[in-house]
């Protein structure tokens, strides 16, 4: 949520900031702005709307060798010009951008800024006014540090001082922020993707650290004044990975990339003998536990439900799955030796990170499944397994979901083999995942079929229901989430056996009901449920796997191993959501009110 880009160097920062903000659009935002510093003149341009709207407002001759930019997701105050970032102090000396939530900003207003008038409704403006207040008696660095010491909550901040053209200041706590190293310039960014065109060498800023940046270098130190030395790392990304290429939308590109991602996971977790292999220390850690808790949000939570099924079948360890945002309110009754698995595409999800901090304080061991090496949850967990999905730009997750399930399958089968589970020993997972990849290719080559179904069932619908049983129920929930995210249709995924316990009351003439069937054991049960809603006027559609398909089913899913069916059955559901959104003229990659990476609680 929100994004920051900062630049200090010898070139004009304008284009670098605007292009960087474009690369951060996937994080979600409702307004944007930049500030350019040219000698002692600071020019601020900001507005509600898209980056393209902002770019049209920036004067063609705007210039500054130091600058900061921001995309805002409203948390305090409406999305409007006044609340957009950057914010300036009363005199205009200080200009700031900020991601995060300051929990005690009203108290700080009362205690320190009673006589100040505020232009915006934001917590951010309180920070910049505090800095100016303290700068009456302190240096900029010390005033910044004093203000930071008073803040309760999360922040990533970039600050410029009108009286100092040679320095850019930044700090973070619980919100991501990086330093990008260049020659005669340095950059600050929420995400490496924002500035990959400028540099691929980065240094992490840790919580409660401040960084003083010039064009020639930077100094990291704690709020207590202790200097910090930290090695840089090279981002394992290519600028071309974050371009759409010939695709109209990132989401469609990322759906099409799933076969390649699945094969990449096979290669990443294969040993020299061609067998799927997981780090032995991870296996030993998990097998020594007596219960596994999977903690995740949204799509990752749905992947976790599939993971529970796989791990319990193979490893014979009980698994609980928790929604991150609810986990901290009522901790489960802990067994003697639990282990926690955190699933997060970005590795920065605020709710999941807070859960990880809590369980580590309690002394429990942790494993993160993430797509971003070097992310906060990757650094802070005891162990990590990577998804190898490459950058996922579209807000609606597709390839990260299938990557999560694939890696969970790798983990489950590896655990099962360690304990001699017959099913785990009998499955050639590399081969079976290869079959999945081939099935995915066949389905992404049948887009026109799904496009037609989307137009027929969903183009003008106000709501839709997805039905499934057993493992198909988990995919039904993910299918409904995808549809509601990008088409704005009120969609829900249900266990079809629960229809008669309330949901069937919502069925009326023309209600779209889509059923997923991949398991022989529940084939006729769910078809009975389909007939029930059909009798009450629903417009029904069945997506079925080859071995259970019947005449009249609208889409046949190629056969894959029974434990891996979610990897296949979700593909037509993703395409269905995509084409439904197109039919309804929705913004596929940047749906309203949504953020890719939720970095505030």
Swiss-Prot record:
Q: Name one GO molecular function term.
A: glutamine-fructose-6-phosphate transaminase (isomerizing) activity
Give the keywords, sorted: Aminotransferase, Cytoplasm, Glutamine amidotransferase, Repeat, Transferase
Superkingdom in the source lineage: Bacteria
The positions flagged as active site in the entry are 2 (nucleophile), 596 (for fru-6p isomerization activity)
Task: Mention any Pfam family matching this sequence.
Answer: SIS
Q: What is its main location?
A: cytoplasm
**Which part of the chain is the Glutamine amidotransferase type-2 domain?**
2-216
Compartments annotated for it: namely: Cytoplasm
According to its UniProt entry, the function of this protein is described as:
Catalyzes the first step in hexosamine metabolism, converting fructose-6P into glucosamine-6P using glutamine as a nitrogen source.
Q: What is the designated name of this protein?
A: Glutamine--fructose-6-phosphate aminotransferase [isomerizing]
């Amino acid at each position: 949520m929100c994004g920051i880009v900062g630049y200090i160097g010898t070139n004009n920062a304008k284009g670098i900031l605007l292009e960087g903000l474009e690369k951060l659009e996937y994080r979600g935002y409702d307004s944007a702005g930049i500030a350019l510093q040219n000698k002692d003149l600071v020019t601020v341009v900001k507005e509600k709307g898209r980056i393209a709207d902002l770019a049209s407002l920036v004067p063609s001759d705007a210039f500054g060798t130091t600058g900061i930019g921001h995309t805002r997701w409203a948390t305090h105050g409406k999305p409007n010009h006044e609340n957009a970032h950057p914010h300036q102090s009363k005199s205009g000396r200080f200009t700031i951008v900020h991601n995060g939530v300051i929990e005690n900003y009203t108290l700080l207003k009362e205690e320190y800024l009673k006589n100040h008038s505020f232009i915006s409704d934001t917590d951010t403006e309180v920070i910049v006014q505090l800095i100016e207040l303290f700068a009456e008696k302190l240096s900029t660095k010390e005033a910044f540090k004093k203000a930071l010491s008073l803040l309760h909550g999360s922040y990533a901040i970039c600050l410029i001082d009108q009286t100092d053209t040679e320095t850019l200041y930044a700090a973070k706590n619980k919100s991501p922020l990086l330093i990008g190293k260049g020659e005669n310039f340095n950059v600050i960014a929420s995400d490496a993707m924002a500035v990959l065109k400028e540099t691929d060498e980065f240094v992490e800023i840790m919580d409660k650290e401040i960084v003083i940046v010039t064009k020639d270098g930077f100094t990291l130190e704690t709020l207590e004044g202790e200097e910090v030395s930290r090695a840089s790392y090279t981002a394992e990304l290519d600028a071309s990975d974050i371009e759409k290429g010939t695709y109209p939308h990132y989401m469609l590109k990322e759906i099409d990339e799933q076969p390649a991602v699945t094969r990449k996971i096979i290669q990443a977790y294969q040993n020299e003998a061609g067998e799927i292999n997981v780090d032995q220390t991870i296996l030993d850690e998990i097998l020594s536990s007596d219960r596994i808790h999977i903690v995740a949000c949204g799509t990752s939570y749905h992947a976790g439900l599939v993971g529970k099924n796989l791990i319990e079948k193979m490893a014979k360890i009980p698994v609980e799955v928790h929604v991150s945002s609810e986990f901290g309110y009522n901790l489960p009754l802990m067994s003697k030796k639990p282990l926690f698995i955190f699933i997060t595409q970005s590795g920065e999800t605020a709710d999941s990170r807070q859960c990880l901090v809590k369980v580590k304080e309690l002394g429990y061991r942790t494993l993160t499944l993430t797509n971003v090496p070097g992310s906060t949850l990757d650094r802070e967990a005891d162990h990590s397994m990577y998804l190898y999905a490459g950058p996922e730009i579209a807000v609606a997750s597709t390839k990260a979901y299938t990557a999560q399930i694939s890696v969970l399958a790798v983990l489950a089968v590896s655990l099962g083999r360690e304990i001699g589970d017959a099913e785990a020993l009998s499955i050639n997972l590399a081969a079976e995942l290869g079959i999945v990849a081939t099935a995915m290719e066949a389905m992404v080559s049948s887009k026109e079929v799904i496009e037609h179904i989307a137009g027929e069932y969903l183009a003008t619908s106000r709501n839709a229901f997805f039905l499934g049983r057993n493992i198909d129920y988990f995919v039904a929930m993910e299918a409904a989430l995808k549809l509601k995210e990008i088409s704005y249709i009120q969609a829900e995924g249900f266990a079809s056996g629960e229809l008669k316990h309330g949901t069937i009351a919502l069925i009326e003439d023309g209600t779209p009901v889509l059923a997923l069937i991949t398991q022989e054991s529940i084939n006729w049960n769910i078809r009975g449920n389909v007939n029930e809603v059909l009798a009450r006027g629903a417009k029904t559609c069945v997506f079925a796997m080859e071995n259970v398909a019947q005449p009249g089913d609208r889409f046949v899913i190629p056969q894959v191993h029974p434990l891996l069916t979610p990897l296949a059955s979700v593909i037509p559901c993703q395409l269905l959501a995509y084409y439904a959104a197109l039919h309804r003229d929705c913004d596929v990659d940047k749906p309203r009110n949504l953020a890719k990476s939720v970095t505030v609680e």
